[in-house]
């Protein structure tokens, strides 16, 4: 179990450091900023690369909502759920701390929202709580459907990380303007701890919606996808 938890810790660290790091450092860099598209690709690439790197050790969840969904789908033991979630959240917090230390090393830096997730006045596009709740549930559900489908025994081995990474990229392309894209409670928690205030007050949604969506995606998959 120790190796699995370390794999989840480092995998989630890489997801937050690479994905949120691209948003903090490179998204709006003067003249050469990577924008929403670059950030979306960064998140997708972090999952793709770490799924290949450590997925064989832990399963490559890197996300409490994924762990919940896999548990509901019967692909993951419930007894391992809490340790996995703790490892994922710890990895996200350490990554956010590293990003904070690096970012504050620049004189006059304005951290803004520090890649936190939000709704209402803290949504990049000013979207409401209901909009944020729905999009996070729907996108996390489809993320789980992609994960469960691409890792099914009837699918050729070795291609799942590509499908999963591309799915996460698409998810970000859709929802960055709405919530800054969570679909991952650990990712949201790490950034919110360093923003404080409103980010912590709104954090509940980015636990509730992805977990509901993850469980819903697993149920939907079980209704039709597990049938041969």
UniProtKB/Swiss-Prot annotation:
This protein's source sits in the domain of life called Bacteria
Query: What is the topology of this protein in the membrane according to its UniProt annotation?
Result: Multi-pass membrane protein
Name of the protein: Aquaporin Z 2
Question: Hey, where's the site called Selectivity filter on this chain?
Answer: 43, 172, 181, 187
Say what the protein does: Channel that permits osmotically driven movement of water in both directions. It is involved in the osmoregulation and in the maintenance of cell turgor during volume expansion in rapidly growing cells. It mediates rapid entry or exit of water in response to abrupt changes in osmolarity.
Name of the encoding gene: aqpZ2
Q: What family does this belong to?
A: Belongs to the MIP/aquaporin (TC 1.A.8) family.
> Can you say where in the cell this protein is located?
Cell inner membrane
| Record keyword Membrane present | yes
Stored PROSITE patterns: MIP
UniProt site (Involved in tetramerization or stability of the tetramer)? 20
> Coiled-coil region(s) at which residues?
none
Q: Which GO terms describe its molecular function?
A: water channel activity
Show where the record puts the motif NPA 2. Answer: 184-186
Q: Does the keyword Repeat apply?
A: yes
A Pfam family this protein belongs to? MIP
Q: What is known of its domains?
A: Aquaporins contain two tandem repeats each containing three membrane-spanning domains and a pore-forming loop with the signature motif Asn-Pro-Ala (NPA).
- Subunit structure, interactors included: Homotetramer.
PANTHER family, alphabetized: AQUAPORIN TRANSPORTER, MIP17260P
| Reactions it catalyzes | H2O(in) = H2O(out)
